[in-house]
A protein has these predicted regions:
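Active-site loop/oxyanion-hole signature of alpha/beta-hydrolase fold enzymes
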Residues: 44, 51-98, 246
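Flexible "cap/lid" loop of the alpha/beta hydrolase fold
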Residues: 105-113, 119-151
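Short beta-strand/loop motif that positions the catalytic acidic residue
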Residues: 194, 200-202
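Catalytic active-site module of serine/aspartate enzymes centered on a nucleophile-bearing elbow/loop
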Residues: 231-257
Length: 257
């Protein structure tokens, strides 16, 4: 099983295919397993896929202070540093990023910090700004504890994070912290520093974020493109995988990647 050690913690990763690299960044409840219906199509199109479980997710170790880390200002810069280290370990020169929801925040932060590493970035269902604290927003949008979730999502979380951790992880992740933080969230100040082609791929009926978030992302980057998936819920990769693959592929082709 491919693990590498980053900051003293075992981080799980997978690499598939050859060609230009695409790094897939999972969302705030996810791990590499969520990409199972997405990555093979990109391998078939001649790309190399890199995906990994960020610290504390999936099969990666969380460390003794994970809760404090998750709720701290360290989360975003350390998530960037983790990807930079993985890039060194795998000896990849530059790559495309596809970030789902919170993964898009990690991707944008990375593209701002290391512009010469990033050929393009796609963000899907990523929040651009909040009008209330994340604690307030999440209490409104995700009121149900793990035991009150539907069986399908419970089983998925157990598959992703293990039977021992799924409930405590979900109940932690649904409060506040992670890439969206604990207070009022706003990506707009950093977006003008993203210099590569940027695709904003958004659903028209996310239970979390409205399409005005997509427009704000699109308006604030210098090389933005905007695609809205009609009749699609928050988890775009899961609800409309064929469209997800098609739109990202044509974006990459349009920029000669």
């Amino acid at each position: 099983v491919p693990f590498t050690e980053i900051n003293g913690l075992k981080i799980y990763y997978e690499m598939h295919g050859d060609g230009d690299a695409i790094v897939l960044l999972h969302h705030g409840f996810g791990c590499t397993k969520m990409w199972k219906d997405i990555y093979p199509a990109f391998v078939d199109k001649g790309y190399r896929i890199v995906m990994y479980d960020r610290r504390g997710y999936g099969q990666s170790e969380k460390g003794s202070d994970f809760k404090a880390f998750y709720e701290s200002d360290r989360f975003r810069p350390e998530s960037v540093a983790e990807l930079a280290r993985l890039r060194d370990v795998l000896d990849i020169d530059s790559f495309h990023i596809v970030g789902q929801c919170e993964g898009g925040v990690v991707g944008i932060d990375y593209a701002v910090r290391y512009p010469h590493h990033v050929n393009s970035i796609t963000v899907s269902s990523t929040q651009c700004y909040s009008t209330m604290t994340m604690a307030e927003l999440n209490a409104l949008k995700m009121p149900n504890p793990f035991r009150d979730l539907g069986p399908e999502i419970r089983e998925k979380l157990i598959d992703w994070h293990g039977v021992d951790h799924a409930e405590s992880f979900y109940n932690q992740f649904r409060t506040y912290g992670g890439a969206y933080g604990t207070g009022v969230f706003d990506l707009r100040p950093v977006l003008p520093s993203v210099t590569c082609p940027t695709l904003v791929l958004y659903p028209d009926r996310s239970f979390l974020f409205g399409v005005e978030q997509a427009e704000a992302l699109y308006r604030n980057v210098s090389k933005g493109e905007l695609a809205i998936l009609p009749h699609c819920g928050h988890n775009t990769y899961d609800e409309q995988p064929e469209e997800y693959i098609r739109i990202i592929s044509s974006f990459l082709k349009r920029h000669n990647f």
